[in-house]
Amino acid sequence: MLFRSITDKHPVVCVSWNEAVAYTEWLSEETGETYRLLTESEWEYSARAGTKTIRFWGDIDEGCDFANGADLDITPESFLEEMKGRGSKIVLPEDWVVADCHDGYKFSAPVGSFIPNNFGVYDVLGNVAEWVGDCWDSSYENSPRDGSARVSGNCNRPILRGASYYDMPLYLRSSNHYGFESKQSENKETRYINFGFRVLREIN
C-alpha cells in the first residue's frame, strides 16, 4: 500500500524500498520503457549538478530558497506534537538544530516549490529522503566506475539520499548517504513519513 501525501503535487511518502522497486517494475511493464531507482552515483551526479560545494547552492547551511529542511518554521515541540497526532513514533535527536531561515513549510512541500539546481532538478536536498538502488557500504571503494548500482556490501540495508524536511542542515549535503536500519521491521519493508523515492527512465 502506498500512502499519498497532502495533495497530488506533494511527494508520495511512507513508501518502503521494496514498494518503490515494485512501482518501477510495474511502470516499466505498463509503458514498455525501463524505469528504476537511481543508483548512488546517478543520484549524486544529478544532485551536485556540476558543483563541488557541500550543497548545490554553496557551502552555507542556510538554503531556505533551495531546500525544505529543518528551519525556523518548526519547533521541536510543535513537530513532535504533530507527529504524535499522525500516529508516528519518530524521535528527534538530542542535538537537533535548525537552519536560521524560513522556508515556509513545517512538513513536506509541493514538488517544485524551491529553486532547482543547475541541471534543473528540483528537491534533491530536503523535502523527502529518497531510496536509491545500491547495497550499503560506508565507503565508495567498491563502487562500480560506470555509475551502475553497487551490488556488494550489505544488500539488506537500503540507502537513502537527500535527507528530508525534518533533517538538520548537517544532513542536507550532496555527499551524505545513509544506510537505513530499522529496529521495528525488516529494513526494506520499513516506511516512514519522510521517506520517498525518485524514478529514473533509461534512454537507449
Predicted regions mapped to residue ranges:
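Short, structured beta-strand segments at or near domain termini in extracellular proteins/domains
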Residues: 191-204
